[in-house]
Amino acid sequence: MLFGELAQYFERIEKTTKRNEMMEILADLFRKVDKEEIDKIIYLLNGRVAPDYEKIEFGMSDKLVLRAMALALKIPLLELERSYKEVGDLGELVVKYSKNEGKDLTVVETFNTLYDIANLSGEGSVDAKVNRLAFLINSLTPQGGKYLVRIVLGKLRLGVGEPTIMDALSFAKVKDKGLRPFIERAFNITSDLGYVAKVFWEGGVEALKRIKVQVGRPIRMALAERVSRAEEIIKRLGKCAVEPKFDGFRCQIHKKENSVRIFSRNLEDNTYMFPDLVEAVLKQFPDRDVIIEGEAISYNPETGEFYPFQVTVQRKRKYNISEMVELYPLQLFAFDILYLDGEDTTSLPYIRRRQKLEEALVEGEKISITKNIITNDPKEIQSFFEECITEGLEGIVAKRLDAPYQAGMRNFNWIKLKRSYQGHLADTVDCVILGYFKGRGHRAKFGIGALLVGVYDDERDLFKTIAKIGTGPTEEEWVKFREILDEIKVEKRPNNVESFIEPDVWVEPKYVVVVQADEITRSPVHTCGRELDGLGYALRFPRVQGFVREDKGPYDATTVKEILEMFRNQKKEKVEEDSDLL
């Protein structure tokens, strides 16, 4: 396939806001590509040349791309810079100035050159990147150049999510979504949709079934549902294991021989943050190849008191890591093992995985196994919960004893019970920032005064609004919000956002914030859950807690289904409170 033809599909996707139409366009595209192209096209749809967990970035600013355009299009740099200020989109500038009708490269040729650009480093690499990008711009159709430039700048933003791509892969083969579960299972244990698509194109469903857990490929993490009372846990699980819930940094640690990689909840490779943990893994899992999960949490070495998440995540800064290790030492509380010496343990029941974890771990200071109790008594669960709260922890997680580890799934195999605050929702909501409103009055100087936030509809692959928030952040945080959001602002509402509210500035759904609210109410202006009866759901008196939650991506946000469940729990609690007063 020529890159110009792929660009035409990108154009069609960009012009539609209908998910089914988008899926059908993708399915039509996939039917036309072969096994050497399918993985590359999947990566390019996400504006990348590798899966998300691989730290491969183009590293080219607007200025460098303008240099490449000037070189390729033979237009003076000053003229391009002036035009860019007027147009605001370097992709559209390529269309305006390119005279390359009739020229083109294949998708594979274009992808391979982009991959080379992303991997160039060292002395002379900047000029080499500019020259290679100029070659591509000069070799592609104007429309192809438009999308090429957007890919390099990280501004492709077609609004295509992984669920839509998985549906389209199935539809391309059998004209329905029937193969989606096989594709999704393979994706959940590899986190690499390009690889999964290539295997599917080469060997069909049987090849997908043969995909196994591999050390080095992060597994999409299992997630817990929520309830508001210990009695509900027993009602759903019966006899179960109960563990503390830490306010830490959830880690998935992969060790093969002497190599260790540490992935965050949103599958970022954060190994650099934890040199002390890497050392501990090598010591406490000697001669074992493992994938384990746990919660890393910083503590005060003098008092033993745990610090909140915001302290642990300070290690995300790529400088002074050794200083942070000394200042904020951390403990890893391991709670699961997903692979051990060649065996995929995800299909084993919880109780067997726990035994294998205990057998594999050598005792040491840095890594310990999360304590647990096994009970069918709600009073014992409540007592354990209160003990955890007294220790400054978030709450508890209950786990079904016979449940496998279900990668990428949120269900009632795991149930969390978190601290409830008087007059507040029993749990916070992880919201995605969708846009912002310019400040008025005192906040006019910041250029930002409120955020439009939403939650994720995982059935429709859309982000839906749930609140406009103007309280919580400090003045310094408002300034930081403006800086990071302006880097991802877009001209119009993104295709994967459903909203009746028009903020002053739309942004790509990327950043997650933790929101506390008093309750969930019905709303005619918000789109969360509105397809049920025409009324949406909204957060009453919402406020942002802290800054951006860096360990979570947009698809890790609270879902519409969770909001509906929280609303039902809230109504149930009110009925019970009222009956207590009678």
From Swiss-Prot:
Cofactor field: Mg(2+)
EC primary class: ligase
GO-annotated molecular function: ATP binding; DNA binding; DNA ligase (ATP) activity; metal ion binding
Keywords, alphabetical: ATP-binding, Cell cycle, Cell division, DNA damage, DNA recombination, DNA repair, DNA replication, Ligase, Magnesium, Metal-binding, Nucleotide-binding
Annotated TM spans: none
Binding positions (ATP): 243, 250, 265, 295, 335, 410, 416
Catalytic activity: ATP + (deoxyribonucleotide)n-3'-hydroxyl + 5'-phospho-(deoxyribonucleotide)m = (deoxyribonucleotide)n+m + AMP + diphosphate
Top-rank taxon: Bacteria
Active site: 245
EC number(s) on file: 6.5.1.1
InterPro entries: ATP-dep_DNA_ligase, DNA_ligae_ATP-dep_bac/arc, DNA_ligase_ATP-dep, DNA_ligase_ATP-dep_C, DNA_ligase_ATP-dep_cent, DNA_ligase_ATP-dep_CS, DNA_ligase_ATP-dep_N, DNA_ligase_N_sf
Gene Ontology BP term (one): DNA repair
Cross-referenced Pfam families: DNA_ligase_A_C, DNA_ligase_A_M, DNA_ligase_A_N
Reported function: DNA ligase that seals nicks in double-stranded DNA during DNA replication, DNA recombination and DNA repair.
Protein name: Probable DNA ligase
